[in-house]
C-alpha cells in the first residue's frame, strides 16, 4: 500500500456530499457523467473562463488547528469599554443545550408553526422579558442590533406620528454606532437628524425623538419631564435602554415613551467582536401593525388548545413588498432564545442580583476614586464610571497602566477615561483598576456600598413574575425544560428541510466548534487593533475567498443579514450615482418574480419600483425589460435581479440583461439568494453584475438558527467599492473613510465568520465546485422523480432546473379542493418540513434539496410527496370526504390517535402512512394553528396557559 494514498485531504467533502450515490442519481436523470450533466444544465454562455482560485482542501483536524492558530493571535483582555457591549457569562446548560445543539440552531424561521412550538415558546419568553423590563404591552421577537432597531424606531415614528415634520431629534448621549446607522437610514427617508442636549429636545418641532437611557458615558438622566413636554406636542418618543439597567431602573413606558429598544447581549450572549446579538423592540399596543420584524402571538389550534405562531405577517416584506414596514426577513432568533433562557434560568432574583452586583462594584469604585480626589464626572450612573483627569498626559498614563495590567478601558476624550462594569467583574478587578487610576497598590472597600442611582429613578414594580421565570433554576429542571421545547421542533437533525431559496444545507460540527472559542467570543468590537490580529487575518481570508468565488474587486462584511446586505448593495449604488452627479436616478426595475425584500429595500432607499414582466418560462421578459429601461433611461438607477432566477432556472439572457441596464445608465444589483447554484460554474461579476449580496447562512453553511443569525456581505466592482459602508469607531479596511454604517459593528456578526471559514477551508477549490454540481444533481433528481406525479412549473435548458424546482399544485387543487397548505401540513405527519409554499408562484411548492442530502433522504421525501398525491386522489375519487381526510385534518398529534376516532381513515393512515415513518416518527405538538384567530386576538406575552383552555 502507498502511504500517500492513506491521507485524504478531501475527507470533509465526502462527509458533506454523498459521492456513493452519484451513479444512481445520474442514471435517474439520464446522464452518463457529472460533466455531461452540468453541460446539459448550465448555459455555456455563463460558464466562468477559469478554475476557482481557492486553496486545496484541509482535513477537519488540520483546518481546526490552522484556525486555532489564527484565533490565538487575538488577545483577550478584561473588557471595560462598554458602549453597548459587555462581557457576560453564558450559563453552561444553555451553551451546551441551545447554542451548541443542532436541534436549536439548524431549524428554520417558524413559518410552519405546528412543528416549531418549542422555539416559538422560547421566543415568547424573550418577548415577555422585553415586555416586563420596558413596561410596554407588545414586543417583537428580535431585530438585528441596537443601531438597526433605533433606525427602525425612527421609521416607525414617522409612520405612526401626527406631527407634520421631517425632523427627528437624537440625544447626543446615544452610542456613536447607533447615530452612524441612523444617519444612513435618515438620508434616504428624507429625514433631518438634529443631535443635541436631551433637556432641550422640546425646543423644536420633531416627528420623533430618541433618548439613551444610561448615556454612552454612563450617566442616568430622568427623562420624564422632557418626554412629557415632547408628548404634549405629539412627538413619538423612543428610548434606547440598557437591558441590564432596566432590572433596577424605571421602565421606558413609565417614563412616558412610546417605543423602547436596545441590545440583549448582556443577557448571556458573548460579545463576539460585535455580534450576533438580538436587539429588542417594544412599543405601545396601538403601533403593533406598524412595527418591524417578527412578533410571536398566542392563538389556538384546530382542537381549541393554545398554540403559538408568528402573528401579523401581513406587515412583512414577503406580503407587502414595497409597502412593508421594513425589509427585515431573518432576525436574531437563536440569540433571542439565549437571552430569554438566561432570564428563565436566573429568574427575577438572579437577574436582580447580577444587576445589583454590577452597580455595587461600579459604585464602590467611584467612591474610592472620589475619596482619592479624582473627578468622577457623573454622580448618577448604573455601571460606567467616567473620570476627568483634567489633562491628556494623565489620561494617557491611566489608560496605558490599565492596558499593561490586562484591562481595556474606554477613552472618552483627551482628558476622560471610562470603566464599564459588567457581569464578570470581580472584586480583584477593583484593586487592579484602582491601581491603574491612582497609582496606589492598596484598595480597601467597604462591604456595604451605597448605590449611585436616585431613588426616584428606581423601579417599583415586580418583573419576571410569570411561572416560566420562576420554575427552572436548578440545572436538572432547566435541562429538561430545554429538552421538552427542543422535542416540539422539527430541525435538520431529524430530516431534510427543502425550503426553496433558503439553502438548508449541512451545518457541520467542525464548522460550528470555533464560534464558542474564547479567542473569538470574548473580544469587544472596539478592542485595540493590536489585540485583534487574529480577527483581522480571518477577515482578510474571508474577503479574499469571496472575491475569488464571485469575481468582485471588493467585499464588505458589515451587513448582518441578507436583507441588510441587499440594502447595502443598493445603498452603494445610490452613493456612487450621487457622487457622479446623478442623484436624480430613482427608478429601480424589479422582475415580477422577485423576493419581497427587493421592493421593500428599494422603497427604503427612496427608489420607485417598476415591475418587469416574466415570460411563460419564468424568465425575465427581455423585450419588456428593454422597453422599460429605455423608457426610464434618464432616471434609471438599477435592476435588482436574482440568479439563477427565483423560478429556479438559469436564464440564458443574463448577459443581455446586464448589458441593457448598463447601456441605459443603470447598475446591476444581483440578489445572491441562489449563489449555491453558481460557485465554480460562473461568477456574478464576470456576467455583468456590479454588486451582489451573499447569504453566508445559506450558501456558506452558517445555520439559520430558527430565524437568525445570518450574514449578508456584499461584493462590489471597483467603481462601487469606495461607497461600501464605513464605521464611526473602526477603520474598516474594506471601505473608504467617511461612509456611514449599516450595522452597529464594523464587521457585523463577526463571531460566526469562522463557520464559513471552516467550510471553505475543508472543502477547498475542488469541493466547492463539487457542492454546486451536487446541488444541481439533487434538484434535478427530485424534479425528475416528482414530475411523474406533479407538473414542474419551470425548466430551462434541456428541461433542466437549477438547484431548486417548483411543483405546481394548482391543477390538483382545482380538481380536489386540497390546498397547498393542506399538503404542507400533511408533510408534518410524514416527518418533513414543507418546502417553500406559494412563493414565487401562488399555489406551488418550491423545493431546494441542497447538495448535502443523501439519495436515501431524497427518496424518503419523494416517496412522501408521491404518497400524498395518492391521498389526494382518494379525495378526488370520493373515497374520503373533502372535509374529513388526512390532508385537511393534518397535522395529527399523539393526542388525536389516543382519543375518540370518528374519521373515515384509520389511525395508522393518519400517523404512520408509510413504513419508514414508524422509524423516523416526529409528533407535531399541536393541531393546525388558527392564524385568523391569532391575529384578531393578539396576545404576544406569556399568558397563564389555563386561560386558553376553554
From Swiss-Prot:
Keyword Oxidoreductase: yes
TM region(s), chain numbering: none
Top-rank EC class of the record's enzyme: oxidoreductase
Keyword annotations from UniProtKB, A to Z: Oxidoreductase, Pyridoxal phosphate
Molecular functions (GO terms): glycine binding; glycine dehydrogenase (decarboxylating) activity; pyridoxal phosphate binding
GO term, biological process aspect, one: glycine decarboxylation via glycine cleavage system
Swiss-Prot/TrEMBL catalytic activity: N(6)-[(R)-lipoyl]-L-lysyl-[glycine-cleavage complex H protein] + glycine + H(+) = N(6)-[(R)-S(8)-aminomethyldihydrolipoyl]-L-lysyl-[glycine-cleavage complex H protein] + CO2
SUPFAM superfamilies, alphabetized: PLP-dependent transferases (SSF53383)
Documented EC number(s): 1.4.4.2
GO CC entries: cytosol; glycine cleavage complex
Coiled coil: none
Cofactor: pyridoxal 5'-phosphate
Modified residues (N6-(pyridoxal phosphate)lysine): 698
Family: Belongs to the GcvP family.
Summary of subunit composition and partner proteins: The glycine cleavage system is composed of four proteins: P, T, L and H.
PANTHER family xref list: GLYCINE DEHYDROGENASE (DECARBOXYLATING) (PTHR11773:SF13), GLYCINE DEHYDROGENASE, DECARBOXYLATING (PTHR11773)
Task performed by this protein: The glycine cleavage system catalyzes the degradation of glycine. The P protein binds the alpha-amino group of glycine through its pyridoxal phosphate cofactor; CO(2) is released and the remaining methylamine moiety is then transferred to the lipoamide cofactor of the H protein.
Protein name: Glycine dehydrogenase (decarboxylating)
Organismal lineage: Bacteria, Pseudomonadati, Pseudomonadota, Betaproteobacteria, Neisseriales
